Amino acid sequence: KLDSVRALQMAPFDSLLRTRKISQQMFELIAADRECNVRSVMAQVGVLLRSEEIQTAAFEGFNPDSDRMLGALGYFDLMEAYASRKLMERREEIMPMVRAGQINTLLIGEYKKVLTGERLESAYAYQWCFAAIQRQYEKELIPLYEEFKHTYPNSPYLAAMQGYYEEICAFHAPKNLSDDIQFMTDTEDIST
């Protein structure tokens, strides 16, 4: 099924390549982008339909640590779907971390198992930034940022991450309460 969808999507670009209206390099970039898109959609459909068969087909022959895929627009969505699938295979084992709000830690841990070099750095930064942008201020993002900064001290992504990191740290910093604040005691009998 994946091959037939890919062939259908690439047919217009095949003719453009044959007539030299696009370069081989552009054709390869488009092919990687379409493959990422198709696999990502298949994976999402498989999750929604709870179809093991569709999810398996979505990742059949998929190499997550491919330079070819890194340039595709849907690469990070596909990587998150791939990592989530791997985590679901261990759902009982990971539930304590899920309950503790460690979902990004789990996803990044999966990335570390299958990605290397620039692909790992990019996926790690993307996952972290995507979580930080949500402004849920997950405390797990603090040590993840510190680990990223230690591992990739010259990463261009650090500039984008630092502002969010500072916001998250400020949110979790102990707050000094004013002495003028008074707390009610014996509130059990108060009717709302």
Residue ranges and their predicted role:
Residues 1-191:
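Oxidative protein folding and maturation machinery
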